[in-house]
Every structure is written in structure tokens, then in C-alpha cells.
């Protein structure tokens, strides 16, 4: 095993890349082979038998899908490559977003038999958002139905990308025998099963015509992007391979083209040329535009990738670790940092000490003495740092652009099975929500239940699974819940009189009050209109308190009441018997009496839902929304996609992630936030109240 830690390469020889793909395109296998050929692994792991290095959580080994982006470092031809493995399942897009934010480039892996699949579109859109340069790998060329030309065309059609093949396959399915390098115009074959012996040879006669035609296409596409090549191409001059690579690198870095490679990671064919492509076409930290940040005066500053600049880094992932507690992954953008030194968390305004710095190799770790600009590293010792926080030098405080995380869209109640589980639960939930900003946990004051919220049903399933496995906490899972409210529709007046005479000191409180409906965004307002001291000043706060407490439990179904203004009009008091308690009780009596006359109604949370879908699924999606009592507000276009905005009651949205996935073959995505509370239709309200 080569030691990585001693090798600090020049910045231009560093690559920070992600590997992104649809769930079954063979991404983890591709990563595995990269680790094998770069000498980081002695035996080849396989997802099918659960020995893949990157999929190191137990759930991943069982489900065969990648959930956590593990960061790994390896060497290839005196370059260092840091790889972030990203999940391909739609419930984990937060992991993909967070990885893309700290990467410089990416390999997009496609299944050559399926071409662009639904999640590939989602991930591609996320990569577009962060302007991440990409190269593509058409994997599974040995699979039945593998069709390189179809797969490349699907990139143009579905992703609106500009794919430029730099290789073509020799054969496909079970006759797949190697690849042709269209720049060098050589055939590449692998001689052994493990794919370590690779030879370049002349192109076999039967593939020559096709290879020449594809090289011509490559030059034509490059000529459109590069003036120098255009001139030489039109003049019929010989264009050198060096010039082709230079022009293609520039086009890739500007996101104007995507070089396409092919092979079969599982059959150990095509991975080494793909690694060469990472060095050839993907950016080093020096090729990236400077990162923007803001200093303590709120002025924008540029953070340059230079180890002589002050230290600046972005924490992009927290991982709860059973052995060391908490690992904080961060990307260093400038400067250098020694282990044992202090960093300033400018987001929180706190200083923290880093006890250890670690380069991660999937689930193994190597301690290092220092890190510098360009590195992706894990640290131990940062207690207060959360995902998205900036770490920097106290002498030059800077805050980098925050990461945006979507609001959770599904909630369920959980309860511990035993008292022992209860004690462990809150600690475990705190650790898990530190680790994953799209996961929330809180105790509902109204019901006393522990509620967990996340990005989808699979997301919460895995959280519950992790509670059991990693934290030995067993929980029972309830049905998804909705937080209803109540309000009044018309003004009403009532009198509240509380008198008790039973020997000794009595109780006396008397109020006359009016209650009016106000905007539902306001919970409660209080106005005192008492004149001439008919109720002494010291009892007025008790009147307000009495109404506030009574409003916590509504008349119809016991839900909290909102949108009410209470006006104290009149009343009376007793020199000896009046007390704060008596006025509190009198006020709550007046409130309960008035609410009955004020036409109380039930309110429900209404969500603002935004759905992004390819056009062909729009009709089905809108029909389904209508069946959920939705009000469609607008339909917009973004390229070949349609954006549907609608208001939908939360109670109608349970199971929506799964339904939308099946209506659009997984190609549509949605976000959902609370828009307002609105009156529940009478028929539905009757059903809820009768429960």
C-alpha cells in the first residue's frame, strides 16, 4: 500500500472530483476500480457481494446503494486525486449538492444500455447550478443492450449537453473487446482479467472507417468552440494531438463540452484511460475562479487558492463516528493549517482547536501533520462546527457563501420502546441532525411526541435503521401527522365572572370582553380599553394571560387557536377578594363563552409546492395534484423542463415523493415549504373533529 500522506503535490497536480450517476449506473464499482488501479487497494471490491470500500455503512452494504459521500484520496501519474463518492438516490440529493459545492470537477457515470436515466438528470442539473466541469464515462459496455451512440445522443437530448466522444468502443455486449482512442487513433486492449496489463495497438480494419468518421466529428465539434482549430480545419491543415487536447480541456473547463469515455468497470476495462482523462480535462484548484466570501464589514473578498494566503475552509459534512465522536470534513480554499492549531469559526463567532487532521480512504484513515489550499480533509476536535460553516484565520475573518438546504418534507412521530432507549434517543437525534442538515428532530409541545422530519420516506427509514444499529436505540414509528389550528370568523362578546365565597378570603374576578378575527399570520393580540380604574392596572396582565392560556386548546378539537384579538371592555373588582388568579379564570371563561358564538373553524397548513418535470409527464402530475385539493398557481418553462407551482394542503401530500416518482419514472423533483394556514372544507373538518 503506497503511503499518501507524505506526498504533497503541486496545486496544478491536484484534482478534487466527484463521481455522480443514476442509482445503478455502476458508480461505486467505477470508484472501486479507480482505487485498485491507483494502488490504494490490493483486492478488487464488489458491490454485488458487499465488499466495496466506498459503501462502508452497514445499510449501504445491504441495500447496495451509496448513502454517505465518503472522501478518498489516491495517486495517479504523480497527481493526487481526491474523490468524493456521491449517492444516486433522489432522497439523498442533499449529499450530492453538498459534495458538488466543494468539488472542482466530476465524472458522470452512465449505463451504456440505459443512457441518461432520471436521477442522472437531477444530478446533472445540480452540477449545472455549481458550474462543475464534467467528463462522462459510458459504463457497462459489456451489458446486453449496450449502445454507445444511443447513450451519447441521450446526453444531448435529455441533458442539453455537448458530449464529445474521445473514445469509441470496439464491439458491445459480450463481444466488447476494448476501446479506440480517437485522439491518438490507437486501439486499447486489456490482456488480463484484472485489467492491469494494457496495450496500445493499431486499429483493427473492421473499426477503422467508424473511428475515422468519429474523429472527424470530434474535430468539427472542437472547431465550433475554438477559433485556432476552426482556421486549421478549414485550411485542411494537420491538427496536432496536443492542440486537440488543449482545446478540449479549455472547452471542458468552460462547461462548453463534455469529453466522453467508455468501458466496463466491472470487467476491468477502460478505467486507466478514464483516470488519464481526469488529469487531462478536469480542473486543478488553480483553474477554478476564486471563491467569494465576505469580511467582517460585509465587503466581498476573493479567496485565492494559495497556501501563503490566510487559512480559509468550508465545512461540508459532519459524520458521527462511533470511535472518535465527530468527524468534520472540510475543503481548504486558501492557506495552510497545522494539526493542534486553533481555527476561527466565523459563522458561529467561535474559536476551536483541531486535535487531528486525517486523510480519509473510505473507512480507513491516515493522520497528517498539516493541510493546505486545495485539500479535502477530515478533522477531529471541532465541537461547534456544523455543515456550511466557514473556518478561517482569526486575523482575517471571512464568511463563505452558505450552503442552501431544502426544508424537510415529511414528518413522522417516533417513540422509544423502553426507558433505556429514551435516554439514548435525544443524544442520537442531536448527532444525526448535526450530520445531516435536511433532517430535523423536535418534541411537539402539543402532543409530547418526538417528531422526525426529512427529505422522503427512504431518508427517514434509514434514520430509524441507524438509530437501531449505530446507537442501539429501538423506536416505534407512527403515522405522518399534520399540525391543525383553529380560529374564529366573526366578532363576539362575552362576560366572565368568577366568584367564590366559602369562609375566609373569597375570590372575585369579573370581565367583559370582545374577541375579533385578525390576520392568521398573527397568533394573538390584546387591547385594554378599561377607563376609570374599574379593574386596577395590576390585574390587566392576568386577564391577557388567562386568554392566552385558554387559546392553547380550541373549542372544536383542542388545537391551538390563532388569528384572534382580545379586547378588555369592562368589568369590576372586589377590594378584598380580587386576585390575579381570579381575573385569569374570569378571562378564560369569557373567552370560552365568546368562541362558541364566533363561528369557530378548523385551519390546516397549506404548502407551497414547486415541481420540476420533463414536459411529457406534466398532464399526469397536474391531474394528480387536482385530486389532492391543489390550487395550481403557475406553469413556467426552464429549457426543456416545466415548473409547476401549486398550493396544496399538507394532509394531501403524504406519500407524494413515492407517487411523483412513479408518475414521472423518477424524473420529476419537488420542493415544499409552508405557505399559510387556511380553512379546512366543512366535510373534511367534520371528519377530523369527530376523531
UniProtKB/Swiss-Prot annotation:
One of its GO terms (cellular component) is cytoplasm. InterPro entries: EFG_II (IPR041095), EFG_III (IPR009022), EFG_III/V (IPR035647), EFG_IV (IPR047872), EFG_V (IPR035649), EFG_V-like (IPR000640), EFTu-like_2 (IPR004161), G_TR_CS (IPR031157). Residues 12-286 form the tr-type G domain. GO terms for molecular function: GTP binding; GTPase activity; translation elongation factor activity. It holds the Pfam family EFG_C. Keywords: Cytoplasm, Elongation factor, GTP-binding, Nucleotide-binding, Protein biosynthesis. Its main location: cytoplasm. It is found in: Cytoplasm. Disulfide bonds: none annotated. GO terms for biological process: ribosome disassembly. GTP binds at residues 21-28, 85-89, 139-142. Belongs to the TRAFAC class translation factor GTPase superfamily. Classic translation factor GTPase family. EF-G/EF-2 subfamily. Catalyzes the GTP-dependent ribosomal translocation step during translation elongation. During this step, the ribosome changes from the pre-translocational (PRE) to the post-translocational (POST) state as the newly formed A-site-bound peptidyl-tRNA and P-site-bound deacylated tRNA move to the P and E sites, respectively. Catalyzes the coordinated movement of the two tRNA molecules, the mRNA and conformational changes in the ribosome. This is Elongation factor G. The lineage of its organism: Bacteria, Thermotogati, Thermotogota, Thermotogae, Thermotogales.
Amino acid at each position: 500500500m503506497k503511503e499518501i500522506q507524505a506526498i504533497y503535490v503541486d496545486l496544478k497536480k491536484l484534482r478534487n472530483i466527484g463521481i455522480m450517476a443514476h442509482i445503478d449506473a455502476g458508480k461505486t464499482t467505477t470508484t472501486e476500480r479507480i482505487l485498485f488501479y491507483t494502488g490504494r487497494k490490493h483486492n478488487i471490491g464488489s458491490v454485488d457481494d458487499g465488499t466495496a470500500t466506498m459503501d462502508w455503512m452497514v445499510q449501504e452494504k445491504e441495500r447496495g446503494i451509496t448513502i454517505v459521500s465518503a472522501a478518498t484520496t489516491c495517486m495517479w501519474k504523480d497527481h493526487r486525486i481526491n474523490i468524493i463518492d456521491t449517492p444516486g438516490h433522489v432522497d439523498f440529493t442533499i449529499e450530492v449538492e453538498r459534495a458538488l459545492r466543494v468539488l472542482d470537477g466530476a465524472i458522470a457515470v452512465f449505463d451504456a444500455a440505459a443512457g441518461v436515466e432520471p436521477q442522472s438528470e437531477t444530478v446533472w442539473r445540480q452540477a449545472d447550478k455549481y458550474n462543475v466541469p464534467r467528463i462522462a464515462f459510458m459504463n457497462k459496455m459489456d451489458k446486453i443492450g449496450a449502445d454507445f451512440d444511443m447513450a451519447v445522443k441521450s446526453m444531448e437530448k435529455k441533458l442539453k449537453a455537448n458530449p464529445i466522444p474521445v473514445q469509441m468502443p470496439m464491439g458491445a455486449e459480450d463481444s466488447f473487446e476494448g476501446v479506440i482512442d480517437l485522439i491518438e487513433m490507437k486501439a486499447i486492449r486489456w490482456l488480463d482479467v484484472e485489467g492491469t496489463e494494457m496495450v496500445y495497438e493499431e486499429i483493427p480494419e473492421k473499426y477503422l472507417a467508424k473511428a475515422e468518421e468519429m474523429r472527424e466529428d470530434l474535430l468539427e465539434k472542437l472547431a465550433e468552440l475554438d477559433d485556432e482549430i476552426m482556421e486549421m480545419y478549414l485550411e485542411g491543415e494537420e491538427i496536432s494531438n496536443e492542440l486537440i487536447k488543449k482545446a478540449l480541456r479549455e472547452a471542458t473547463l468552460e462547461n462548453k463540452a463534455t469529453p466522453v469515455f467508455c468501458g466496463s468497470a466491472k470487467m476491468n476495462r477502460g478505467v486507466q484511460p478514464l483516470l488519464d482523462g481526469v488529469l487531462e480535462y478536469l480542473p486543478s484548484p488553480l483553474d477554478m475562479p476564486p471563491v467569494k466570501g465576505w469580511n467582517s464589514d460585509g465587503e466581498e473578498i476573493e479567496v485565492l487558492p494559495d497556501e501563503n494566503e490566510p487559512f480559509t475552509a468550508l465545512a461540508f459534512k459532519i459524520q458521527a463516528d462511533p470511535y472518535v465522536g465527530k468527524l468534520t470534513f472540510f475543503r481548504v480554499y486558501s492557506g495552510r493549517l497545522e494539526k493542534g492549531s486553533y481555527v476561527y469559526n466565523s459563522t458561529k463567532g467561535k474559536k476551536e482547536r483541531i486535535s487531528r487532521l486525517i486523510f480519509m480512504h473510505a473507512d480507513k484513515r491516515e493522520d497528517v501533520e498539516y493541510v493546505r489550499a486545495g485539500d479535502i480533509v477530515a478533522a477531529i476536535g471541532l465541537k461547534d462546527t456544523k455543515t456550511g460553516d466557514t473556518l478561517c484565520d482569526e486575523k482575517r475573518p471571512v464568511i463563505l457563501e452558505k450552503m442552501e438546504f431544502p426544508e424537510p418534507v415529511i414528518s413522522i412521530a417516533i417513540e422509544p420502546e423502553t426507558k433505556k432507549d429514551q435516554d439514548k434517543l435525544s443524544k442520537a437525534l442531536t448527532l444525526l441532525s448535526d450530520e445531516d442538515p435536511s433532517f430535523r428532530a423536535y418534541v411537539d409541545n402539543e402532543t409530547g411526541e418526538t417528531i422526525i422530519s426529512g427529505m422522503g420516506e427512504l431518508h427517514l427509514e434509514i434514520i430509524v435503521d441507524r438509530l437501531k444499529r449505530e446507537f442501539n436505540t429501538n423506536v416505534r414509528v407512527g403515522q405522518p401527522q399534520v399540525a391543525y389550528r383553529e380560529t374564529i370568523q366573526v366578532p363576539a362578546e362575552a362576560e366572565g365572572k368568577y366568584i367564590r365565597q366559602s369562609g375566609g378570603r373569597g375570590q372575585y374576578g369579573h370581565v367583559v370582553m370582545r374577541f375579533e378575527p385578525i390576520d392568521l399570520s398573527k397568533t394573538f393580540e390584546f387591547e385594554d380599553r378599561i377607563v376609570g380604574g374599574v379593574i386596577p392596572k395590576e390585574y390587566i396582565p392576568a386577564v391577557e394571560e388567562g386568554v392566552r392560556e385558554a387559546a392553547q386548546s380550541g373549542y372544536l378539537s383542542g388545537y391551538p387557536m390563532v388569528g384572534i384579538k382580545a379586547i378588555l371592555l369592562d368589568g369590576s373588582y372586589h377590594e378584598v377578594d380580587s386576585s390575579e388568579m381570579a381575573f385569569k379564570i374570569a378571562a378564560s371563561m369569557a373567552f370560552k363563552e365568546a368562541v362558541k358564538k364566533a363561528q369557530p373553524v378548523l385551519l390546516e397548513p397549506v404548502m407551497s409546492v414547486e415541481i420540476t418535470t420533463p414536459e411529457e409527464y406534466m398532464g399526469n402530475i397536474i391531474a394528480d395534484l387536482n385530486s389532492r385539493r391543489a390550487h395550481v398557481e403557475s406553469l413556467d418553462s426552464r429549457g426543456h423542463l416545466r415548473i409547476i407551482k401549486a398550493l396544496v394542503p399538507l394532509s394531501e401530500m403524504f406519500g407524494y415523493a413515492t407517487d411523483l416518482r412513479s408518475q414521472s419514472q423518477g424524473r420529476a423533483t419537488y420542493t415544499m415549504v409552508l405557505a399559510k394556514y387556511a380553512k379546512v372544507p366543512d366535510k373534511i373538518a367534520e371528519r377530523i373533529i369527530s376523531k
